[in-house]
């Protein structure tokens, strides 16, 4: 009995395990693979900061790649692609957008893809960067599309990796939620929910130990002292994604465009809310990919038949080979 009590006390006194760690509302406590840099600016009458990663190449090719993360991702989740493009001679920049990860979550903020595009342009202006290869994944694909439509003279090439928003969910019949309803859902997010969703959507029902880092990155913010702030901004961002489609403007893109899409993806915002007859037709990425490729003038389409929503994480070698082959030189 005495030994049991001693063991129990030691366990209680032990530091939190990785699965139990909590992070601040701006991801304080979570370590990125490189020191994050900060861009301080004013947006919507508030002082804000945008965290970003920047890698400089040993043998520059004179080009800059900007990597835009998705809704459940951060700049750090681009780690493999950051390293790969740096090795290929690119200067590589990956920002955390306002409202995400290590960047500010302002007290009040009107989220729009237009605003996030302006913020990204301001970061590039501050760094003296003109033209970029713009790579957007998931929600970052919607943002990259908006940026390319607004600032086509700044984009040498647009690359979209399993972008969401290839269909208009509300037009397809998905019930619209209020921000308060999104918030109620986000307040209940757990690591188990995140893991189950990522397993089925990102990784085609496969799981590897390295994926857990990204589950805990997100879950740790919800568990932390600023968890309600994280949930509120997540609700605002979901509302932005749901109500601001970009697909109707694909035909207006005038930059070289490369689509890299895992066909096993089944992402559709609010799909769980839809009636069965609507739910069954949402997130059909084989069809959506081909339709999008046809809608964008001159687009190139590369399909990964066995991969899901995050091909750059599920099969980095194959993804990076397709990426470098598809980049204009």
Spans of model-derived segments:
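Conserved acidic catalytic loop of the alpha/beta-hydrolase fold
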Residues: 114-132
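Conserved serine/cysteine hydrolase catalytic core
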Residues: 223-294
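Glycine-rich "HGGG/HGxG" loop immediately N-terminal to the catalytic nucleophile
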Residues: 76, 97-113, 169
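Flexible "cap/lid" loop of the alpha/beta hydrolase fold
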Residues: 145, 149, 158-189
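Conserved alpha/beta-hydrolase catalytic His-Asp/Glu region
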Residues: 189-250
């Amino acid at each position: 009995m005495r030994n049991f009590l001693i063991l129990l006390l030691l366990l209680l006194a032990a530091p939190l395990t990785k699965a139990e760690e909590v992070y601040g509302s701006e991801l304080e406590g979570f370590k990125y693979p490189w020191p994050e840099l900060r861009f301080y600016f004013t947006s919507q009458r508030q002082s804000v900061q945008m965290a970003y990663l920047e890698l400089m190449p040993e043998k520059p090719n004179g080009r800059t790649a900007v990597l835009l993360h998705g809704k459940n991702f951060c700049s750090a989740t681009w780690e493999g692609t950051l390293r790969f493009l740096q090795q290929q001679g690119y200067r590589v920049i990956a920002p955390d957008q306002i409202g995400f990860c290590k960047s500010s979550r302002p007290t009040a903020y009107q989220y729009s893809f237009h605003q996030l595009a302006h913020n990204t342009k301001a970061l590039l202006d501050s760094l003296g960067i003109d033209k970029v290869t713009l790579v957007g994944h998931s929600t970052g694909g919607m943002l990259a599309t908006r940026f390319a439509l607004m600032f086509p003279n700044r984009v040498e090439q647009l690359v979209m990796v399993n972008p969401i928003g290839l269909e208009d969910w509300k037009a397809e019949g998905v019930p619209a939620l209020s921000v308060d309803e999104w918030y109620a859902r986000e307040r209940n997010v757990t690591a188990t929910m995140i893991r189950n969703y990522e397993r089925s959507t990102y990784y085609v029902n496969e799981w590897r130990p390295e994926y857990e880092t990204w589950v805990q990155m997100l879950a740790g913010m919800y568990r932390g002292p600023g968890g309600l702030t994280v949930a509120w901004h997540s609700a605002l961002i979901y509302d932005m994604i749901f109500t601001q489609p970009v697909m109707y403007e694909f035909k207006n893109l005038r930059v070289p465009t490369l689509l890299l899409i895992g066909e096993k993806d089944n992402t559709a915002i609010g799909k769980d809310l839809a009636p069965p007859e609507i739910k069954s037709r949402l997130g059909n990425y084989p069809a959506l990919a081909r339709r999008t490729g046809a809608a964008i003038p001159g687009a190139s389409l590369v399909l990964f038949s066995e991969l899901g929503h995050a091909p750059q994480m599920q099969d980095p070698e194959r993804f990076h080979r397709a990426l470098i082959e598809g980049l204009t030189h």
